[in-house]
Amino acid sequence: MKQLTPRQAEVLALIRSAVQQTGMPPTRAEIASELGFKSANAAEEHLKALARKGVIRMMPGTSRGIQLLTDEPEEDEGLPLIGRVAAGEPILAQQHIETHYQIDGSLFHPRADFLLRVHGMSMKNIGILDGDLLAVHKTTQANNGQVVVARVGDDEVTVKRFERKGHIVQLLPENEELQPIVVDLTQENLSIEGLAVGVIRNGNWL
């Protein structure tokens, strides 16, 4: 199987997640909206590339005509472990993957798509410690109170609790020594990379 680009891997992860949660693949428009493409045509081009690489089959005549043929390459090896993510780069870029863990993502709810190595103690009060592996479900949507993997502008990703009121978002640490990150959505871009769905420490789920 040919190696996927980071964007193709994101599209494939989204398809797998949609099938897992709803029993059906997403439409082209849904893929474009979820991943920030300018049009459904851009999503179509990525789907054609995935079909050429043998991981999906496209069925004409239906907006949800996508059939998964094989597991995502990373799943054959386990969940990818993402180390430190450079500013402005896709979180699933190949250069960020340190290794793979033989963990079934469906054991988490919602399904885990990757693991992220935690740096720092900003979430220590809820048991997320420096060096832990955070199981993450890839999505661009978050509700108030959820722990998210987020990126402000082109900065590195951060793990914080999400709170939004109007156009103001606070990314709240669980550490009384640290201050929230306040984002005015009219002035800055905020990207949600995923939701925290579990913590692994020393090989054990917490």
From Swiss-Prot:
Catalytic activity: Hydrolysis of Ala-|-Gly bond in repressor LexA
UniProt keyword annotations, A-Z: Autocatalytic cleavage, DNA damage, DNA repair, DNA replication, DNA-binding, Hydrolase, Repressor, SOS response, Transcription, Transcription regulation
BP term (GO), one: SOS response
DNA-binding region: 28-48
TM annotation in the entry: none
EC number: 3.4.21.88
Source species, domain of life: Bacteria
Enzyme class, broadest EC rank: hydrolase
CDD domains in alphabetical order: S24_LexA-like
Keyword Transport attached: no
Sites marked Cleavage: A87, G88
Active site: S122, K160
GO molecular function: DNA binding; serine-type endopeptidase activity
Record function comment: Represses a number of genes involved in the response to DNA damage (SOS response), including recA and lexA. In the presence of single-stranded DNA, RecA interacts with LexA causing an autocatalytic cleavage which disrupts the DNA-binding part of LexA, leading to derepression of the SOS regulon and eventually DNA repair.
Subunit organization: Homodimer.
Family: Belongs to the peptidase S24 family.
Protein name listed in UniProt: LexA repressor
Organism of derivation: Tolumonas auensis (strain DSM 9187 / NBRC 110442 / TA 4)
Gene (UniProt): lexA
